[in-house]
Amino acid sequence: MMNFDSLKGWLDWQESLHPLAIDLGLVRAARVYQALNPDGNKPLTITVAGTNGKGSCIAYLENIYRAEGYRVGSYSSPHILKYNERIKIDGKPVSDELICQAFARIESVRGDTSLSYFEFGTLTALDIFRRSELDIQLLEVGLGGRLDAVNIVDPDIALISSIGIDHVDWLGATRSSIAQEKAGIFRANTPAIIGDCEPPLSLLQCAVDKSAHLFCINKDFHYQKQTTTWDWFSGNTHISDLPEPGLKGEHQYRNASSAILAVELLAKKLPVSHDSIRLGVKNSQLLGRFQLINDKIPVLLDVGHNP
């Protein structure tokens, strides 16, 4: 059994542990997760997939729940500067010590099961979150959905932010095939939120086939921009005077709207005031996403690899 004194030591070893950098499938991660967590206990869970907008939706959810005072864990990838950014509790990256302790626990139970770098990280986040008395955990899919390691956890809400052409070697070359892969996060009798304005029919059909409760933007929920604010609507619920999203771009109204619906759908278990929603939307930030760096010369930084 391997053990290392530093986070760098663990990460260097993990990069060489598995023969493939990307190896989709749930069997390996699920086997180790069962050994780590035989009772299957977990916090309330929102899983977010999508070609673009996953990280933004996670950011809105995290900040809304934190504004209400809940204890929130968020898992996302990749990191910008430091590995710890992937695993946050209450908006702060967890320590090297916590990550290394989780790595050691995983190593102690994995036996001869080979894990990819991403699978190790996903299991680490889940293990840390399970031990942290969270009110809710927010999980960002790494690639696709159906066979992504995040999908070993059954979500209480599944959210798909958008469908575009990406990772065609693994997900297929059409929006239809990619949508089917991402729809793998849907569960029976569980809300499935779609933030894409023109979702492929295959995505809608997958929701029906899985008996998920489908909510589509511009049909089941929508937003309306005012002069300096915007309003959100779903059924009989109306949230007025929302501030401009902290993340910039017209598409961020869709992402924020999808996140708000997720919050509203979980309101019986985790009530959130409209004031907290307003504050969370306003305060959301994301490293490397239209990030304005104010120095002597203003710099706009964006690391998104899709248009």
Describe each PLM feature range:
Residues 42-44, 131, 136-141, 148-159, ...:
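Nucleotide phosphate-binding/pyrophosphate-handling subdomain across enzymes
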Residues 6, 20, 26, 30-34, ...:
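ATP-dependent carboxylate-amine ligase catalytic core
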